[in-house]
Amino acid sequence: MKIRIILRKMSYENSKHRRILKSCLITWFSNPKELHLTNPNMTYPFKFNQWMNLSYKGQNTETWVAFLGDWVVGMISLKQISEEKRGHLFHLYVDKQNRSQGFEQKLIRKIEEKMKEHNLNILTLNVVPENSKALALYKKRGFNIIDSNKKKITMSKNV
């Protein structure tokens, strides 16, 4: 049986969406390793306001959330850098119980669609070196390493 997942655009500026996102993020990031792999700039324990201030305040971003029925199972965000015709993928996360079922791929495809709609040609992302599963996923999706150091690997792909 094929699992049906619905992607919905959500905004941190919408109070209802913010409540939903906050609840999910607090649950997902109760584990410091999960938080570090998703956003190494965050400190543990997870603080929602810090999350918003670091990544979503005054940014030209959109966030897509994966729903399995009424349950939020994942999310992804895109920052548009129009003057460079570039988008930056960040905060791709799927909860542990729903990983490796194609949800990550579907979320990335959604971002690639949005890139085309916004006339953005280059998609970049950062990943921590110890996140081998994410690295493998991004390579499978056609991303190439363009820079790396001990703290992060930067990848890019033409869309």
What are the language-model segments listed below?
Residues 92-99, 128:
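A short, internal acetyl-CoA/4′-phosphopantetheine-binding micro-motif in the GNAT/acyltransferase core
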Residues 102:
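Conserved G/P- and acidic residue-centered "switch" motifs that form tight phosphate/ATP-binding loops
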